[in-house]
């Protein structure tokens, strides 16, 4: 088995709650049990809401709980690396610009549900013409970006659940970059990942 590395990656946009605490505890216990390392990674990708005061409280809470970390990192320190990867993915056509407003996306979601269909993104942005894009930008719209999933099965062997499989066609292309250019959790976490165990179900799906 590879050297075990686990991590607790809170977003400093608020105070810790019971869910955060449980996640930190499970990761710390697993690292302790198998002689691995437990890392604290500050996920400060949300530029507007991240605050140092929340970081300080998170550290104090972990120390009070006795959950001592062996190393610490922060996502914002790696933005240059994330920008490099983003540029490559855009060039490869794996990240694409979308101009829908939140209201338009919500309308699409409700319409799909009303028809008994899964509320996955319809990839309308891939059909936008140069004229469409010029029109949106003239309206003052700024694009957000999605990661284009490739067709086929995504599968792996989970130590708890056994073989897990998802069909990419049944999943929405995830939004990875906000309108203001900041990264959502998905992209930096995948680029930065070097952890061997314990992932949240919603992260994997």
Please give the residue ranges for each predicted region.
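N-terminal Rossmann-like or analogous alpha/beta NTP/dinucleotide-binding catalytic cores
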Residues: 1-114, 180-182, 198-199
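Active-site cores that bind ATP or allylic diphosphates and position pyrophosphate for catalysis
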Residues: 96-199
């Amino acid at each position: 088995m590879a050297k075990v590395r686990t991590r607790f990656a809170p977003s400093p946009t608020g105070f810790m709650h019971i869910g955060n605490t449980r996640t930190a505890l499970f990761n710390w216990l697993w690292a302790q049990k198998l002689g691995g390392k437990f890392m604290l990674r500050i996920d400060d990708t949300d530029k507007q809401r991240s605050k140092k005061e929340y970081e300080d409280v998170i550290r104090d809470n972990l120390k009070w709980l006795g959950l001592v970390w062996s190393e610490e990192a922060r996502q914002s320190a790696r933005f240059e690396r994330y920008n490099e990867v983003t540029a490559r993915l855009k060039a490869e056509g794996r990240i694409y610009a979308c101009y829908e407003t939140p209201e338009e996306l919500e309308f699409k979601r409700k319409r799909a549900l009303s028809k008994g269909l899964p509320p996955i993104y319809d990839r309308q942005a891939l059909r936008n013409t140069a004229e469409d894009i010029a029109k949106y930008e003239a309206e003052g719209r700024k694009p957000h970006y999605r990661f284009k999933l490739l067709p086929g099965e995504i599968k792996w062997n989970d130590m708890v659940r056994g073989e897990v499989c998802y069909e990419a066609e049944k999943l929405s292309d995830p939004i990875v970059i906000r309108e203001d250019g900041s990264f959502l959790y998905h992209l930096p976490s995948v680029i930065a990942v070097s952890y061997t165990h314990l992932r949240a179900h919603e992260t994997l799906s």
